[in-house]
Amino acid sequence: MKYDFDEIIPRRHTNSYKWDSAADSDVLPLWVADMDFRTAPAITEALADRVGHGIFGYTRVPDEYYEAVCAWFKRRHGWAIEKEWMIYTSGVVPAVSAIIKALTVPGDKVLVQTPVYNCFFSSIRNNGCEVASNPLVYENHTYRIDFEDLERKASDERVKVMLLCNPHNPAGRVWTREELMQIGEISLRHNVTVVSDEIHCELTYPGHAYIPFASLPETVTGHAVTCISPSKAFNIAGLQIANIVAPDEEIRRRIDKAININEVCDVNPFGVIATMAAYRKGEDWLDQLLAYLQGNYRYMKEFCTEHLPDFPICKLEGTYLVWMDCRTLATPSAELEHRLTREARLWLNAGAMYGKEGEGFMRWNIACPRAILAEGLERFKDFIVHKT
């Protein structure tokens, strides 16, 4: 392997949200979704060149940026994005919030598929809307969509938007074309706009191809809006950059107004440079990263099968977030998170933060050197041995 993903890079005392948020330095953080790997060399080299210039004034988004994004998605995913459809923004979470603001009024409902990314809930409620849930069905260590329930929920006249997570965090599903088609047909039938968070789109594994929702026929997608970013795949979340893709001109105008309502979307020069480098020169690094992450998942699956048979993990089709079933402990997940942090010195995410359907589950971030993952699994095993 050309890139050394086994290298352990100290991250404490770098103001890392992941590593420096714990009160004690011996807590192993396998929680929030950023990776413990250096980003692609092409990105660090491009950033170093930009830093060397020494002037960091107001920045515009050049045509080359849009060309790099469009070329990447066309080549790698077969999705033809037009430059005019894109809105630059500082992240997917503020993008989702602005889209909800643009497409709803207070009192409307926004549909989600729980368990789901926790920031969806705050983005909905902070805009004065209500959360409507289409719970995913957990069976055989994976999740499927209850389409009958989705039809019922979408038929509510107060439901105006559906937030789709594709690939899905934390379930690890990569929705198939057939599943996405059904979502589109139901949403279109009930005049519900699909807003697809596709931030994990590059992180899929063999046999599970990412299908951009908006790449489906327009007769299915309607006025769909998509949020994309290189931040997860290339580990550049701190550079705060993302794109909204909205083919419909009127919807795009409303979203652009909502984003700029507080005039807080100035361009980050480093995010622009990093994105262009990632999409132009980062593909080989990404492919090797995916192979390493797949190896981490295999390692964890084998470890759990041998040492933690009562704690099955979901089949991982995409993302680097593994969903573990801990219901055998009959312990609320928030309490389990607290006890693991205090007693095992291991920080995982409590499943309940992703909706009540996540209660009893824990989310692991396996985007780290294998030695760190192994240490985390040993700590979890020791905790279970002493607890039981």
Language model features with spans:
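N-terminal glycine-/charge-rich "phosphate-binding" loop or analogous flexible N-terminal tail
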Residues: M1-R12
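PLP-dependent class I/II
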Residues: D4-D6, A22-L28, A33-D49, I81-E82, ...
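Conserved N-terminal alpha-helix of the aminotransferase class I/II PLP-enzyme fold
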Residues: R50, G57-S90
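An N-terminal-biased, well-structured beta-alpha scaffold segment characteristic
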Residues: R11-S25
